[in-house]
């Protein structure tokens, strides 16, 4: 994949990505940061940590700002991914809740596959 995800709002990174037509998902959390990321040209605001306020926060942000794409990360798992999508997230990102470090270290592909399937089923249930 050719894209950039930033941990924080970095207008200079957004500008550089726009110059080279690279999609950029800018880190943001507060409504001000989210709007600033969008106005700077980010394709979406990466809302982190999403688990802090949960799907209700995404829904609350989308109400007055329906034009801004939100990408919740941090605390997204197979049990709540559907709730984030129903709340208005255009996509989500997951790390350790999808690929557990122990399973990766042990090359437990079955466990990783099972988690991926659980995520896929949860997402499919929303469509």
What does each model-identified segment do?
Residues 4, 68-71, 89-91:
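Short glycine- and Lys/Arg-enriched binding-loop motifs that mark or flank ligand-binding interfaces
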